Amino acid sequence: MDLYWDKTFLREQQRVLDKQIEWALEYGLPVVLHCREAFDHIYNVLKPYQQTPLKGIFHSFTGTSEEACRIMEFADFMIGINGVVTFKKSTLPEVLKNIPLERIVLETDSPYLTPVPNRGKRNESAYVKDTLVKVAGIYGNSPEKVAQVTSCLLYTSDAADE
């Protein structure tokens, strides 16, 4: 749901999101949520599904600590962190201090939001290592440990314990 440029089709976006959630539950698939200037709207759509097996990722999360904590209310939702965390004025390093490492995934928003030191270039998957290094520093872990936790949990629920 994207309300950054235009709120004209909010009702339609909400109906489509409801349908996608219905399909996700029916087929046991995750939802990937694009949330831009629309957190409260998405949260209100998700709230009735809180006690269901719905799972997903808040892709390209750039929200507040409060919003991140509200996402944590949904046991099977992850927060997608990309190059924004490396930006000088990013608030994500502070936000992440309240979020368990096990609840984030590293991602790109390619071709956008290229992490420092490549900011200004077209983003690509190879640059996720820069996001990884930044996140490792925030959590006080090695990049290898962060890679293991954030990658394995995407595919299996108990991989971080290995």
What are these regions (language model features)?
Residues S90:
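Conserved catalytic/ligand-binding micro-motifs in nucleotide and anionic cofactor chemistry
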Residues E102-S110:
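Non-cysteine beta-strand/loop elements that form the S-adenosyl-L-methionine
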Residues Y155-D161:
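Conserved small/polar residues in nucleotide/adenosyl-binding loops
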